[in-house]
């Protein structure tokens, strides 16, 4: 198969951490042609989706003493050329957040592809509809108490009722901009003003879960089914477990409660064409559903001795 990956600049990716590189490596190993492009290199020509694609050859990472060893150079790009995306059997939309106007237009271009001929992972419409914070609200039964608002009074009332909380920007990623807020914090007004861009944007406010100190679990779902998990433990006084802010990873198991959460999400994820998803769970509560470019494959592979990228490609092969 020919597989196209819409990514951030290749030189900015960390092959020892990046899930996209892991999936591309797996595709290459299993005999498929791998191409890369960017959201800025998509076009519509005579009603068809096209992309400026460059074939890529990867030097796979190697696990040595529990760490990924990366060869240099780890990738080799051919000269890019315009190609109709209908020539590809699948397109992986793996551009990191934030979701910009350019990103949204890219999803409209990708929607011109017939899913039965060229599968887009994840679905363009699904990506537009599934804001990673707001989408979670459809599963309120398994979430901690949550409010979304830009109103200081409502947010203060929430804190008085539920105690300490975390404030999350609706368009954030990798723990960026998440703040811890105590009911009696003298900086309350300032923190809310910062989070809401001075009353211009609503934020998500969730009850703080003390279990966060034991870890924020990332569970990878493929077509709605859990295929692996990793625990991300905050470092020092930090309350966020995200790897991007220094969280340490540890092996973990998927509990019966978490299997129930996955089963609850599965029908909706499948209906929305969200095939490759990473959910975050703290203390048995769903906190986020990550659909744009979920990470965690490299860490799970390293800790569990598996190859989740190959699972993704083997699943894809069965779709045709």
UniProtKB/Swiss-Prot annotation:
EC number: 6.3.2.3
Names of required cofactors: Mg(2+); Mn(2+)
GO molecular function: ATP binding; glutathione synthase activity; metal ion binding
Protein's pathway: Sulfur metabolism; glutathione biosynthesis; glutathione from L-cysteine and L-glutamate: step 2/2
Coiled coil: none
Domain ATP-grasp residue range list: 133-317
Short name of one Pfam family: GSH-S_N
Recorded catalytic activity of this chain's protein: gamma-L-glutamyl-L-cysteine + glycine + ATP = glutathione + ADP + phosphate + H(+)
Keywords: ATP-binding, Glutathione biosynthesis, Ligase, Magnesium, Manganese, Metal-binding, Nucleotide-binding
Entries under InterPro entries matching the protein: ATP-grasp (IPR011761), ATP_grasp_subdomain_1 (IPR013815), Glut_synth_pro (IPR006284), GSHS_ATP-bd (IPR004218), GSHS_N (IPR004215), PreATP-grasp_dom_sf (IPR016185)
Cofactor details (free text): Binds 1 Mg(2+) or Mn(2+) ion per subunit.
Binding site for ATP: 159-215
Binding residues annotated for Mg(2+), in chain numbering: 288, 290
Gene Ontology CC entries for this record: cytoplasm
Family to which the UniProt record says this protein belongs: Belongs to the prokaryotic GSH synthase family.
Protein name, per record: Glutathione synthetase
Species assigned in the record: Synechocystis sp. (strain ATCC 27184 / PCC 6803 / Kazusa)
